[in-house]
């Protein structure tokens, strides 16, 4: 049940104030649980603070002094069922160590899904040894090793950063449409693999923002055997007073949309997104590499927003 995966039951909530992340992280399974819950919490934060679902589609949880809203299965709100199914599909790919990046994309024209208005990137790495991941100390990344308390603090900081940004963004268009693209590590992912709720995607070589895009790094968390990095790209005009609270990328926004086998140089292997320009991946780059496997939801989601 997705409800159990995303938010547990109400009795657990009463038993502890810190119900989201496990109290100890000592092995690969517990590390996976942390990353799953962090991913689900971030998606819940985004959908709640961007006003995509009603209050009734969320459950209350606490993480230290943070009051969080966690998306739940709400039969009265079919959209919540769509998103939870997407999250479950990501969980399946994470368990198998196939998932490289999940990209939650918001656009307005169903005939032009490449013309985006907001993007949320979740990039995943794996290690068998459980060693500490290295993150850029000059950015708003949060280092964490295998110490359980450090991991919880890192998760809390990342979620807090995301909350700060969401609360300082201007509103989305009323007719926004949601989809999620999943990118894989080609070397280990079977050619015919598709997570539940997903199908093979048509590979797009470009994305387009109608306005000027700005890319913001929310941070990174390592849980020992897994790590997750979060980046948000939105229109610059949508930024209110949170510009100095998060780390911005200078110049042209780069989205890792193709060529996702480049583990260490994320920005170098993405397709650029520029103001009113379709920027294609260089043919010489793509022709020298195996075609990238990408999945998309069987059904996209159109929120009933007014």
From Swiss-Prot:
<feature type="domain" description="HORMA">
    <location>
        <begin position="29"/>
        <end position="232"/>
    </location>
</feature>
<dbReference type="GO" id="GO:0005634">
    <property type="term" value="C:nucleus"/>
</dbReference>
<feature type="modified residue" description="Phosphoserine">
    <location>
        <position position="271"/>
    </location>
</feature>
<dbReference type="GO" id="GO:0005694">
    <property type="term" value="C:chromosome"/>
</dbReference>
<dbReference type="Pfam" id="PF02301">
    <property type="entry name" value="HORMA"/>
</dbReference>
<dbReference type="GO" id="GO:0000795">
    <property type="term" value="C:synaptonemal complex"/>
</dbReference>
<dbReference type="GO" id="GO:0051321">
    <property type="term" value="P:meiotic cell cycle"/>
</dbReference>
<comment type="subunit">
    <text>Interacts with HORMAD1.</text>
</comment>
<dbReference type="GO" id="GO:0005813">
    <property type="term" value="C:centrosome"/>
</dbReference>
<keyword id="KW-0597">Phosphoprotein</keyword>
<comment type="function">
    <text>Essential for synapsis surveillance during meiotic prophase via the recruitment of ATR activity. Plays a key role in the male mid-pachytene checkpoint and the female meiotic prophase checkpoint: required for efficient build-up of ATR activity on unsynapsed chromosome regions, a process believed to form the basis of meiotic silencing of unsynapsed chromatin (MSUC) and meiotic prophase quality control in both sexes. Required for the DNA double-strand break-independent, BRCA1-dependent activation of ATR on the sex chromosomes that is essential for normal sex body formation.</text>
</comment>
<dbReference type="GO" id="GO:0005654">
    <property type="term" value="C:nucleoplasm"/>
</dbReference>
<dbReference type="GO" id="GO:0005829">
    <property type="term" value="C:cytosol"/>
</dbReference>
<keyword id="KW-0469">Meiosis</keyword>
<dbReference type="InterPro" id="IPR036570">
    <property type="entry name" value="HORMA_dom_sf"/>
</dbReference>
<keyword id="KW-0158">Chromosome</keyword>
<keyword id="KW-0539">Nucleus</keyword>
<protein>
    <recommendedName>
        <fullName>HORMA domain-containing protein 2</fullName>
    </recommendedName>
</protein>
<dbReference type="GO" id="GO:0051177">
    <property type="term" value="P:meiotic sister chromatid cohesion"/>
</dbReference>
<dbReference type="InterPro" id="IPR003511">
    <property type="entry name" value="HORMA_dom"/>
</dbReference>
<dbReference type="InterPro" id="IPR051294">
    <property type="entry name" value="HORMA_MeioticProgression"/>
</dbReference>
């Amino acid at each position: 049940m997705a409800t159990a995966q995303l938010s547990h039951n109400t009795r657990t909530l009463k038993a502890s104030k810190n119900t989201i992340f496990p109290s100890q992280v000592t092995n690969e399974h517990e590390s996976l649980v942390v990353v799953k819950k962090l991913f689900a919490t971030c998606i819940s934060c985004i959908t709640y603070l961007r006003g995509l679902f009603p209050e009734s589609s969320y459950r209350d949880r606490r993480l230290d002094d943070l009051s969080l809203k966690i998306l739940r299965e709400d039969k009265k709100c079919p959209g919540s069922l769509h998103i939870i199914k997407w999250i479950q599909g990501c969980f399946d790919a994470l368990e198998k160590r196939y998932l490289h990046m999940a990209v939650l994309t918001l656009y307005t024209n169903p005939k032009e899904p490449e013309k985006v208005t907001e993007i949320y990137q979740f990039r995943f790495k794996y290690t068998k040894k459980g060693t500490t991941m290295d993150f850029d100390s000059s950015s708003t990344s949060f280092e964490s090793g295998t110490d359980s308390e450090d991991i919880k603090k890192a998760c809390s900081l990342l979620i807090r950063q995301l909350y700060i940004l969401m609360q300082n963004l201007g509103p989305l268009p009323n007719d926004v449409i949601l989809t999620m693209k999943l990118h894989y590590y080609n070397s280990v992912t079977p050619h015919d693999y598709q997570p539940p709720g997903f199908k093979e995607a048509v590979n797009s070589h470009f994305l387009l923002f109608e306005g000027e895009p700005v890319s913001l790094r929310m941070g990174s968390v390592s849980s020992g055997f897994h790590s997750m990095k979060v980046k948000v790209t939105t229109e610059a005009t949508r930024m209110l007073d949170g510009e100095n609270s998060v780390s911005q990328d200078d110049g042209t926004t780069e989205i890792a949309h193709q060529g996702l086998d480049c583990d260490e140089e994320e920005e170098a292997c993405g397709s650029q997104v520029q103001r009113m320009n379709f920027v294609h991946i260089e043919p010489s780059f793509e022709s020298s590499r195996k075609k990238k496997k990408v999945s998309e939801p069987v059904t996209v989601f159109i929120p009933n927003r007014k």
